[in-house]
């Protein structure tokens, strides 16, 4: 684009409040931190040596993997395959939540009417087979990921993109259905793979039939040694095309990144202590306090740290499947939540390490507080016919608090009494040894999980529910089986974590939108179907300023919390990690927004002793 064109676009943005953008990057809101000629990100060591290895366990509850295709619903792909083997047009940073810089695309140009964006591909970009990354590959990837053969979340994420047009060998245009400041970022997040991936005699297989075909991506790593279902190693591509790019300088320094799979937390932790792998993130406060101890920690062989971060909090809770008749009445869901004594759990089990999750955007500016503000009311009033009056007149619901003070009105007995009143209003009364509805059906609840770690929480919760006449069955199954049941919504209550975002947007359609409630494999596991929620999500994704986004998300949070779709859990403001001493070095500056596993594998590097050991192994 000419200098005059850039100046004109900047002037238009200034006058009309358009999203800020520049050829080398795009910012949804505000300014772009790094200029076009920047050398490297501040939080990396540009001179980090290459070599050595790091071995980890996946931060999820993955217990197996059976495919190399991370883009389809059936089966489980290895951890980090998408981020290490495949790449996107733009790449985000760990210090700017709503800005992305050119990776496969060397520049992005937003149309003056903001209804399309053109990405120009970097002529250096190459797939692992040596082929250039071309516009036709970008279109192919988009078409495949929005087809019925792909996992449903991709059709939701890219639902506001009407299509992709190849303009030239290295230029591709994404066409948008409406003006939406997030859409260039969404387009830029498209994973790109070669048209040749899955080809058989020049004919492409449907995406869902590409299972164990070796991926043809452009990322810094290729698949190395694999023990299917148990462990996988990624080998650094020494001829990686972007190794000298500013957005990759100082990144991906290990020659090998390996992941090991263990069946449960106990086996995993014991293996870590025995030296089977290098790095682990802890999620259970009791384990962190009592199990991450011993001779190896005392001697300094193993290091445990609590790392500060600026991430938005994750929403974690026991999620109700509101497709089940027993959970359709909000009073039943609210009553069940009253039976969980978080304060007791925090004292007795969690070493007072947690704060209570309050809303769906915990720990961020997007969390609703008090009564609706004037800005929220302006959003809620047009939806009055869909909402209960208390949304407008009462403070946003808070998770129940259990007090030890008998005069507080909030003892466990008080909460259970309130729960019983709600259940009675909903038609559930105690008779014949159980809580029953007018048809005589007993209220029984199955808590489904893939690990028994939550059992110590469910047990006291179940005892309180039994006082109301509700019987609880806590069932632990393999993660792969659990995932299959979640995909078809075959559950009653699950413990689940909804990952937070510094700028929530289109992903909310799949998490809370009515359409996603009926799509197998979608993230709306709670089955939320609410016209007000749909309307507010639509407002969120069309926000043109950060202030608009804040008010719209607060209104959405308020409506969701009045729906009592989950029993909120707890969260921590730190990352708990442990790793082997003397094997790694880290940049001097820690970024603000990061996940520990990605931070370690992306920008840490091997220590001299690690490099020396690796050199001996190679010889």
Predicted segments, located by residue:
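Surface-exposed binding/hinge segments that line
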Residues: 8, 120, 155-201, 218-227, ...
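N-terminal lobe/hinge region of extracytoplasmic solute-binding protein
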Residues: 23-112, 140-143, 216
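Detector for C-terminal structural segments
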Residues: 25, 58-60, 80, 227-232, ...
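Aromatic- and charge-enriched surface segment that lines or borders ligand/interaction sites
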Residues: 44-49, 72-80, 107-151, 167, ...
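Gly/Pro-rich hinge or "lid" segments in bacterial periplasmic/extracellular proteins
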Residues: 75, 81-96, 188-251, 255-258, ...
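Aromatic-rich, solvent-exposed beta-strand/loop patch
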Residues: 102-106, 128, 133, 175-195, ...
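Ligand-site clamp/hinge motif
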Residues: 122, 209, 242-292, 334, ...
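Extracellular/periplasmic solute-recognition and catalytic clefts
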Residues: 163-166, 224-235, 260-324, 331-335, ...
């Amino acid at each position: 684009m000419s200098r005059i064109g850039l100046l004109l676009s900047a002037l238009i943005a200034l006058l009309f409040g358009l999203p800020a953008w520049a050829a080398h990057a795009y910012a949804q809101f505000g300014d772009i931190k790094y200029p076009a000629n920047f050398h490297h990100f501040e939080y990396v060591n540009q001179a980090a040596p290459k070599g050595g290895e790091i071995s980890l366990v996946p931060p999820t509850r993955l217990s197996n993997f059976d495919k190399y295709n991370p883009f389809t619903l059936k089966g489980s792909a290895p951890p980090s395959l998408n981020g290490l083997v495949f790449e996107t047009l733009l790449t985000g940073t760990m210090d700017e939540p709503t800005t992305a810089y050119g990776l496969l695309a060397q520049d992005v140009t937003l149309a003056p009417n903001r209804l399309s964006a053109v990405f120009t591909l970097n002529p250096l970009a190459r797939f692992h087979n040596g082929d250039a990354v071309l516009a036709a590959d970008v279109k192919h990837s988009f078409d495949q990921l929005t087809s019925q053969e792909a996992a449903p979340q991709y059709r939701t994420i890219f639902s506001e993109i009407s299509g992709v047009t190849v303009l030239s060998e290295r230029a591709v245009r994404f066409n948008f259905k409406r003006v939406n400041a997030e859409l260039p970022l969404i387009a830029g997040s498209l994973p790109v793979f070669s048209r040749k991936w899955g080809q058989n005699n020049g004919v492409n297989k449907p995406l869902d039939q590409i299972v164990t075909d070796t991926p043809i991506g452009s990322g810094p790593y290729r698949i190395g040694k694999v023990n299917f279902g148990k462990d996988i190693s990624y080998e650094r591509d020494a001829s990686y095309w972007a190794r000298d790019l500013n957005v990759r300088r100082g990144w991906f320094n290990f020659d090998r990144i390996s992941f090991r799979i263990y069946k449960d937390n106990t086996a995993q932790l014991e293996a870590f202590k025995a030296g089977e792998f290098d790095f682990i993130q802890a999620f259970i406060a009791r384990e962190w306090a009592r199990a991450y101890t011993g001779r190896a920690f005392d001697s300094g062989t193993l290091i445990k740290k609590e790392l500060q971060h600026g991430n938005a909090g994750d929403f974690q809770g026991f999620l109700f499947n509101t497709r089940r008749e027993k959970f359709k009445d909000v009073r039943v869901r609210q009553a069940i939540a009253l039976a969980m004594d978080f304060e007791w759990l925090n004292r007795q089990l969690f070493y007072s390490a947690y704060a209570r999750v309050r809303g769906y955007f915990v720990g961020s500016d997007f969390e609703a507080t008090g009564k609706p503000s004037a800005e929220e009311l302006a959003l809620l009033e047009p939806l009055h016919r869909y909402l209960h009056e208390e949304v407008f007149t009462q403070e946003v619901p808070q998770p129940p608090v259990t007090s030890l003070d008998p005069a507080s009105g909030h003892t466990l007995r008080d909460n259970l009494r309130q729960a019983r009143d709600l259940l009675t209003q909903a038609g559930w009364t105690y008779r014949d040894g159980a809580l029953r509805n007018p048809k005589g059906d007993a209220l029984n609840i199955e808590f489904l999980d893939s690990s028994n770690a939550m059992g110590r929480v469910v047990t006291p919760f179940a005892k309180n529910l039994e006082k109301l006449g509700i019987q609880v069955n806590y069932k632990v199954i393999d993660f792969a089986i659990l995932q299959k049941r979640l995909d078809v919504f075959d559950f009653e209550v699950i413990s689940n974590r909804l990952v937070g975002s510094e700028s929530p947007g289109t992903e909310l359609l799949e998490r809370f939108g009515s359409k996603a409630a009926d799509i197998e494999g979608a993230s709306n596991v709670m089955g939320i179907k609410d016209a007000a929620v749909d309307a507010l999500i639509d407002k969120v994704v069309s926000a043109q300023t950060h202030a608009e986004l804040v008010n719209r998300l607060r209104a959405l949070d308020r409506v969701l919390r009045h729906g009592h779709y989950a029993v909120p859990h707890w969260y921590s403001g730190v990352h708990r990690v442990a790793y082997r001493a003397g094997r790694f070095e880290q940049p001097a500056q820690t970024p603000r927004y990061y996940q520990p596993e990605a931070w370690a594998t992306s920008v840490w590097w091997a220590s001299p002793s690690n490099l020396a050991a690796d050199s001996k192994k190679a010889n």
